[in-house]
Amino acid sequence: LNKKSDYSILNEVTKRDLSRHFILANDKNYKKMKKLILNITLLIPVLLFSQINTSKKKVLMVVSSYGKDMGASRPGYEFDEFSQAYLVFKANNLKVDVASPKGGKVEPDQYNKDKLYNQKLLEDQEALNLLKNTKPTASVNAEDYDAIYIVGGKGAMFDLPFDPSLQDIILKLYNRENTVIASVCHGPAVFANVKYNDKYIIKDIALTGFTNMEEELFGKKWVKEFPFSLEDQLTSRGAFFKQTDFMLSKVVVSGKFVTGQNPFSTAKSAEEVVQTLGLQLVNRELYTDERSVLLIQDILDETTTIDDAKAVLNKDVSQYDIPLMAIYGYYKILVANDKRKDLVKGTELVELTSPYFFNEDLQLLLAKTYVKIDNKEKATQVAKDLISKNLLKEEAEKLLRDIK
């Protein structure tokens, strides 16, 4: 319907009604009728405006079809990433559809059902139905969507970059104004083979994704079977690959592209999609792992001191994922390559979590690292503590002898 002409026609009807009732000015119901007509006249523009603006923005979430046996036989999509992104979109009133190269039911890698965002997703029957009945990408009409969000997981490396229908969807969104093309973790692999006018669409685009270091640390099971290295391939296609330290939050917005580096970048990348679509973002409570990663990031960037971090944990440790923070300290030490600054930061993280989380192997590593950074006093203290608890006693005693 032509909204402007509808308004004009209704206005003419209203004028005729007003003229008719002007003649009946002495009628006792005139004043009531006049008020009613005036209210209707004022309401018409509001009704017409609301008809134009009630349609929801729509986002197509895409997951890999490659997974089998919860990732045991073949890697699939990351359930954590799907959960976080879906919940952000739903909370911000976006209409969500889910597609995969083959369509139908899709298999995620193994995941932790106790995480709050996964619990919420598993309680959402609509979301579960979408995952059981994904749309085949060949059946998707790109014109129906304002945004696409490619979920990561190692399975994305095996099928998404080679799906011509998915490439067509991305190209149509690429060539349409006011659209968003987003992905997280291994999801940006989909961009590796998408061209427009013989040029890769990510040429001169700043983006991020799962880095070479993250693959080395966390992707050993499948990385040798990958068709390409994600970081290297995107760089070779002309993209400006951006990254932060391993498994910290990093989101890059470049034109209509929104990308997240790893699973801990998921919620923020989904929120960037919402904002890039021009919508007002709904406030939400951070998840414990998300809050923990942000605290780690602040410690490493030295925007938060260790003393301040201790105070934060003392105030309410339940708001943080302590094992995650401790394990991050372990990996920080592991990849430090004897760089003193990185070794110190790693020990600080392990120290920070020690009152709440104890692991003898981690404590032994901490003691050995103290030796490397010339803090023999603390190394001795940790080694003696292990001996007193009869944990890794031989290794701890050897360390004490080496210190002397």
Segments from the language model and where they lie:
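Bacterial Sec-dependent N-terminal signal peptides
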Residues: 1, 9, 19-54
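Targeting/processing segments of secretory and organellar proteins
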Residues: 7, 12-14
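Active-site-adjacent beta-strand anchor residues
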Residues: 184, 259-260
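Short, thiol/selenol-centered motifs that function as redox-active sites or metal-ligating centers
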Residues: 181-188, 270
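Extended, subdomain-level signal for the structured scaffold at the beginning of enzyme domains
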Residues: 52-175, 190-208, 213-225, 229, ...
